[in-house]
């Protein structure tokens, strides 16, 4: 090559494989306010130093590849590369480390959770030098979060739409989740809403199966909620699941829901995908629909302590992609969820500003600026005896969802709804009077049974039901 045509890439180029840590481990780096920060739990293969493992994560999730390439010289790696800037051992784990990685903002497309995850939790998770890798947390800077619409409406707008304040909202997933005809399904919806619930819900795997096509379900559920509204004088809703095999079909279902005049639709955001979810969230804001989000498939990703991605990351991603509700575990029910960890990501969903707090699994201070909050939904194996704990743990800005705990009532669906509404009102009143629900909760429920035979019957049925298993995902 003549000197006149010599490129920058040819200057100092040396072919071959080099240690990642020579380029991507930078303990002297001072993070910028605009950097996206990640905390990875890294388990290196035997013989791989933690600095090399952390640098490999930074490289493979940003600009690096397995060998030196000519085209490195055609760009500014110092501007675009991810940097492993700190490594700390995990207490009690001999071979695990927390690697902190900083990513320049220019690596990511604006307003795209899909692009963000494709880089940060992409091929690097299959890297052979690592036995396991888990993304524990992300810090999303305001410079990036402001490129997202976020939730279609948020907590305050939802309360204003429903005209319901000062208490958690009550819901119920219709059971059996599969097999009912559309008319029988709508009947169950009506009975639950008439009994005092605010919402009923399609189960996550109810889409448009042969036993109940989506259009029939939408029509019967709309009829049910309008009838219940007329009889109770309260605004009601049913989460109509718009999830479908294509984005076009999903949007068609959302459009039909809007034409029916219902207040809320639903999406399975992990199985449906972030691109579909963000599209639906934009439609919901533009057309006045609330958006309920189910997290089906999350445990495949987040349940193991050493590999995958913690749910707090999925929760942050959902807040950016868009949703007004999201299932967040119960702490006390049948599904996985340790109290402090759960409250950590519940705050990340609801609050504007969340301080770093390692005792709750929050690795970074997060400032959402003006992005609306998301209501956490407690659902899964809960019943009236859990009501005091749920009210105390989740507070007013939440949805408490009882499926079997409503429809399993010995007297029927409407009495099951009455029992839950009475239990909730009793707990809220007791709390407002200054009583300690954590200590006096059972007594509050027993007192309420004296003036609600429906609640008394529910308490008798579920007095021995417990789900006492150790939580897998602990700090």
Swiss-Prot record:
Residues 1-2 form a propeptide. The modification N6,N6,N6-trimethyllysine is found at residue 14. It catalyses: 2 (2R)-3-phosphoglycerate + 2 H(+) = D-ribulose 1,5-bisphosphate + CO2 + H2O; D-ribulose 1,5-bisphosphate + O2 = 2-phosphoglycolate + (2R)-3-phosphoglycerate + 2 H(+). It holds the Pfam family RuBisCO_large. Binds 1 Mg(2+) ion per subunit. PROSITE patterns: RUBISCO_LARGE. Substrate binds at residues 123, 173, 177, 295, 327, 379. The active site is at residues 175, 294. GO terms for molecular function: magnesium ion binding; monooxygenase activity; ribulose-bisphosphate carboxylase activity. The disulfide bond which can form in the large chain dimeric partners within the hexadecamer appears to be associated with oxidative stress and protein turnover. Mg(2+) binds at residues 201, 203-204. GO terms for cellular component: chloroplast. It is found in: Plastid, Chloroplast. The keyword Magnesium applies. One of its GO terms (biological process) is photorespiration. InterPro entries: RuBisCO, RuBisCo_large_chain_AS, RuBisCO_lsu_C, RuBisCO_lsu_C_sf, RuBisCO_lsu_fd_N, RuBisCO_lsu_N_sf, RuBisCO_lsuI. Its main location: plastid. The modification N6-carboxylysine is found at residue 201. CDD domains: RuBisCO_large_I. PANTHER family: RIBULOSE BISPHOSPHATE CARBOXYLASE, RIBULOSE BISPHOSPHATE CARBOXYLASE LARGE CHAIN. The basic functional RuBisCO is composed of a large chain homodimer in a 'head-to-tail' conformation. In form I RuBisCO this homodimer is arranged in a barrel-like tetramer with the small subunits forming a tetrameric 'cap' on each end of the 'barrel'. Belongs to the RuBisCO large chain family. Type I subfamily. RuBisCO catalyzes two reactions: the carboxylation of D-ribulose 1,5-bisphosphate, the primary event in carbon dioxide fixation, as well as the oxidative fragmentation of the pentose substrate in the photorespiration process. Both reactions occur simultaneously and in competition at the same active site. NCBIfam families: PRK04208.1. This is Ribulose bisphosphate carboxylase large chain.
């Amino acid at each position: 090559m003549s000197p006149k045509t010599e490129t920058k890439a040819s200057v100092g180029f040396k072919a071959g494989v080099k240690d990642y840590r020579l380029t991507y481990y930078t303990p002297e780096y001072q993070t910028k306010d605009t950097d996206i920060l990640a905390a990875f739990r890294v388990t290196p293969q035997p013989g791989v130093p933690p600095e090399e493992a952390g640098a490999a994560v930074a490289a493979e999730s940003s600009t690096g590849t397995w060998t030196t390439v000519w085209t490195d010289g055609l760009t500014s790696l110092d501007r675009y590369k991810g940097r492993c800037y700190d490594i700390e051992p995990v207490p009690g784990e001999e071979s695990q480390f927390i690697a902190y990685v900083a990513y320049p903002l220019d690596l990511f497309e604006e307003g795209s959770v899909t692009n963000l995850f494709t880089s940060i939790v992409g091929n690097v998770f299959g890297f052979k030098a690592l036995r396991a890798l888990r993304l524990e947390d992300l810090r999303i800077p305001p410079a990036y979060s402001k490129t997202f619409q976020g939730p279609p409406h948020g907590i305050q707008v939802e309360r204003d739409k429903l005209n319901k304040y000062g208490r958690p909202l009550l819901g119920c997933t219709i059971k059996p989740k599969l097999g009912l005809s559309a008319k029988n399904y709508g009947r169950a919806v009506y009975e639950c809403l008439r009994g005092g619930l605010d919402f009923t819900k399609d189960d996550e795997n109810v889409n448009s199966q042969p036993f109940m096509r989506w259009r029939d379900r939408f029509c019967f559920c709309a009829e049910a909620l309008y009838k219940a509204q007329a009889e109770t004088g309260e605004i009601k809703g049913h989460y109509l699941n718009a999830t479908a095999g294509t984005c076009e079909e999903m949007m068609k279902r959302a459009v039909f829901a809007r034409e029916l005049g219902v207040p809320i639709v639903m999406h399975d955001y992990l199985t449906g995908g972030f691109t579909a979810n963000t599209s639906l969230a934009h439609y919901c804001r533009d057309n006045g629909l609330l958006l309920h989000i189910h997290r089906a498939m999350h445990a495949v990703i987040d349940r193991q302590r050493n590999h995958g991605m913690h749910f707090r990351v999925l929760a942050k991603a959902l807040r950016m992609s868009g949703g007004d509700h999201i299932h967040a575990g119960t702490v006390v029910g049948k599904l996985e969820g340790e109290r402090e960890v759960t409250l950590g990501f519940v705050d990340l969903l609801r609050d504007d500003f969340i301080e770093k707090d390692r005792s709750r699994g929050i690795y970074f201070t997060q400032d959402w600026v003006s992005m609306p909050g998301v209501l956490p939904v407690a659902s899964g194996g809960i019943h009236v005896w859990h009501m005091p704990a749920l009210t105390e743990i989740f507070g007013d800005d939440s949805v408490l969802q009882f499926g079997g705990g409503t429809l399993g009532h010995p007297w029927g669906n409407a009495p099951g709804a009455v029992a839950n509404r009475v239990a909730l009102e009793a707990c809220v009143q007791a709390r407002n009077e200054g009583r300690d629900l954590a200590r006096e909760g059972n007594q509050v429920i027993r007192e309420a049974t004296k003036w609600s035979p429906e609640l008394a019957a529910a308490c008798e049925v579920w007095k021995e039901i417990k789900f006492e298993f150790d939580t897998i995902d602990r700090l």
